[in-house]
Amino acid sequence: MAGEQKPSSNLLEQFILLAKGTSGSALTALISQVLEAPGVYVFGELLELANVQELAEGANAAYLQLLNLFAYGTYPDYIANKESLPELSTAQQNKLKHLTIVSLASRMKCIPYSVLLKDLEMRNLRELEDLIIEAVYTDIIQGKLDQRNQLLEVDFCIGRDIRKKDINNIVKTLHEWCDGCEAVLLGIEQQVLRANQYKENHNRTQQQVEAEVTNIKKTLKATASSSAQEMEQQLAERECPPHAEQRQPTKKMSKVKGLVSSRH
């Protein structure tokens, strides 16, 4: 339905409202809850709160670093900085691994199991596939497992939080995408133009052929009519001489009759 919000969105809003009025250890406990909460995979709004940013100056700076890592980082980033960060619970660890899959999916549409096993520091294929299935059920990715070729084929993934410093790169990418679209559009327009020209030439040729066929039909019809008239004329000429010969004896007979009458 239009305007319907997912429970995770409402849950994040509740955490943000709670965070606005807390500080110190209460705020770090709230951050830990957010990082464990099912369905919450974006943290930018929470990071923007002034009291959350103030954690950078105190003894709880590690929690701000951890929140930043969940917003922008991956599981390998956590492993690389593990000594200076709070220990993750099982739920937090799985969520960060889910977010790592999302980051990989944004760059690759077919992710080899070998890459996933390495980045997620997993050795068991069954556990890896279970983790991927969990990510699919949380709607952060859509795809299918190709067990034969050991690939995760990605159809869709959610967007992660964006750093301000990354905005210029995003704008650049969008400009390049627009330029690519314009190039494709120009190519399509040229193909349409060539197709229209081909169609016009084809229609013109077809009209010429039809006109020639019509002329040939007229010529054949006229020739056939002329031949028929000639044949009729020849037949008529052949029939005329016998009639003339029959008339001449009649005249001679009348002359003979006249001579006979005069003698009498």
Swiss-Prot record:
Residues 235-248 have a biased composition (Basic and acidic residues). GO terms for biological process: COP9 signalosome assembly; protein deneddylation; regulation of protein neddylation. The keyword Acetylation applies. Keywords: Acetylation, Coiled coil, Cytoplasm, Host-virus interaction, Nucleus, Phosphoprotein, Signalosome. Its main location: cytoplasm. It holds the Pfam family CSN7a_helixI. Residues 223-264 are annotated as: Disordered. One of its GO terms (cellular component) is nucleoplasm. InterPro entries: COPS7/eIF3m, CSN7_helixI, PCI_dom. Belongs to the CSN7/EIF3M family. CSN7 subfamily. Residues 223-232 have a biased composition (Polar residues). It is found in: Cytoplasm; Nucleus. Residues 188-237 form a coiled coil. This is COP9 signalosome complex subunit 7b.
